[in-house]
């Protein structure tokens, strides 16, 4: 199976081309065709010799993904189900915001983190995506915009889809460098957010990268007992380790950390728990932000339900009174399979039923 050329950073592409007897500018031309003209085949690169196009075709594919399902919401949210070269399925979401167009990308096939409320973890991790497969998600959404010919572009990226990004650290970092490259898609680092469930050692590594990319942490509970019961990762990285790493990140980068907090009815949404959360984040209040997220129910996790609006607002009020920077997240795509992993899970179930029916 040939790798996608999207797996290479610009420097790596230059090195690869020079090793094959090409001038550096040839790699720059190829990069422009990929990320500025956004061609889908090497044959479309009209200023590249046929001999070198043949070498490119022997070495790489361009976009490795195949579109399986597209769902479009009344609010303009678009959910894509893509098939990988090995037949596995991943999800990508386009969200139209007042500030631009944001894309949520997947980094793994399945997830091993084991959050008990999440659709993504219904199927255990089968493999990491390579950086080309992650970048290809952005390129296909941008192609959707290009085909519409309305001058739209992907302006923001959130690495919050299926999988734990920091469990696929090397490929995620390569992806970030490709989409941030000023000579390509040029998506600003401060318009990119990577979300982790709390791999403390990788948060420290991320702090040392020197990138201006935003960091979000999936917190979802204000104490170790509750967090360990709903997020298995907390047993390896309890709040003490997690917050030590977060404090290191803030000290090293002077950048704000966003805490994601899904509101689960009568699980983590009490007034007492709101006060615990305010106390937990007290020492980093100036450089932290809490995002309260309405829960998208998942049929396989029917022990959980969405917090009623009045409980969310009461929780929010406690945080605000304690000086916590916080917001209730705007919902997108509520009329489609909005929860991360739902569309993939449903499609895989249908595929299995078709196979069974033909036997």
UniProtKB/Swiss-Prot annotation:
Catalytic activity entry: adenosine(2503) in 23S rRNA + 2 reduced [2Fe-2S]-[ferredoxin] + 2 S-adenosyl-L-methionine = 2-methyladenosine(2503) in 23S rRNA + 5'-deoxyadenosine + L-methionine + 2 oxidized [2Fe-2S]-[ferredoxin] + S-adenosyl-L-homocysteine; adenosine(37) in tRNA + 2 reduced [2Fe-2S]-[ferredoxin] + 2 S-adenosyl-L-methionine = 2-methyladenosine(37) in tRNA + 5'-deoxyadenosine + L-methionine + 2 oxidized [2Fe-2S]-[ferredoxin] + S-adenosyl-L-homocysteine
Q: Which GO terms describe its molecular function?
A: 4 iron, 4 sulfur cluster binding; metal ion binding; rRNA (adenine(2503)-C2-)-methyltransferase activity; rRNA binding; tRNA (adenine(37)-C2)-methyltransferase activity; tRNA binding
| Cofactor(s), names only, from the UniProt record | [4Fe-4S] cluster
Report the EC code(s) recorded for this entry: 2.1.1.192
Which domain of life, per UniProt? Answer: Bacteria
Compartment annotation: Cytoplasm
Predominant subcellular localization, coarse grouping: cytoplasm
Q: Any miscellaneous information on file?
A: Reaction proceeds by a ping-pong mechanism involving intermediate methylation of a conserved cysteine residue.
Q: What family name appears in the similarity comment?
A: Belongs to the radical SAM superfamily. RlmN family.
What is the protein's given name? Probable dual-specificity RNA methyltransferase RlmN
| Organism annotation | Streptococcus pyogenes serotype M2 (strain MGAS10270)
Q: Which gene encodes it?
A: rlmN
